[in-house]
């Protein structure tokens, strides 16, 4: 599948549809597995998450899937949208713990599936390969399998060695944020990719918000292209990753992160979130590009 999609660098305009944030947010059903792209405090789909939280009613009983989860994910946890979490890290990097996730984890308000970088990588690889599991020596000799009874062991038929069989990870909806999208449906990301490319090829539905609309994506050494038809829907969302960074357009808004942490630690999450949601998203000119 990877090689097939990679070969289609400039596709058919009919393959991908440009929509607005409100329409995109309506595509996330209750109870689904929602993956959010980016890494820690870099290029997270914050504008999409805020629009999701403007929905009435808000989505519920979601399983959050992130290689690393951060600010945008903490908003969803604090708003009561998340039932289960699958990630190997949930925090705000140098700005500390993710306060709403930490509180929910401490009170038992979330189902947390124990994950490591290896377990997520193997589960994603299995899904991309179309197989039920991916064998690995990761977790051998640790107590981690005791925390995940769904993770089984297999015997290597060639060596007789016992291996961990990490099950394939399913994903209903993946949302990424990129630099540019064109009318053909191609998307340009910067090179701090995380597992964004893998999310494109393992998820049932892919939505990408972008900083800019261009006539035709141009290749460059400091960026990567998600070729059409990797994303089913594109959304024009300028500054859509703020307050996380979107290199080279803007840096991490450190003061906003500190304001968020202070608000949550002082019991002010609802007031903080309410202030964010009252701000209208930027004009979505991309909705007219379909």
Residue spans for each PLM region:
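Tryptophan (W) side chains
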Residues: 2-3
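Conserved alpha/beta enzyme-core scaffold
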Residues: 14-290
